[in-house]
Amino acid sequence: IAQMLCFLLGLLCGSINELNAFSPFAVAFVTAVSGKYTISAGLGAAAGYILTQDNLSALRYIAAIICSVILIRLTNELERLKKFRLLPSCISFMSLFLTSMAVLFADGTSVRSFFIFLSEATLGFALSFVFSSAFDALTVYSSQGGFTARDIVNVGALLSVVLLSLSEITVFSASPAR
């Protein structure tokens, strides 16, 4: 059930598409998910990107997901790096930034595009931190049976991103997620 839930959350995060090609949500989600759920979250995120993005953007984000999954798996083997709290955020930033720079240099460089890609990677860094904090809070909740105030904020941020992905769904011209 948890694998299916991670797949669906990855699919929802991959379907968030802001400004027609600004979607770091699923890459941040995949880097924040714990080890055994990484593959299902990555497959869901890739499916979300394929269903909602154009070919070049979907390919760029899928390359970032693959890079993130490989780096997360490699760093899980190194005990010293495994304990670094910002590791998922750094991997998310690096994956988004490097794939964006590859697209930028292939299409021709412009200052505006560079800053858009830099802001996307920075947003991916922040979102990955929020997602990993929310997953840590859910892990603590399941082991101790309660949330702290900080954990409630982290889980609330995760839920708001999920609602953002559902904001395009309308029922009688009203969006329940909004």
Language-model region placement:
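Short helix-perturbing small/polar motifs within transmembrane alpha-helices
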Residues: 1-178
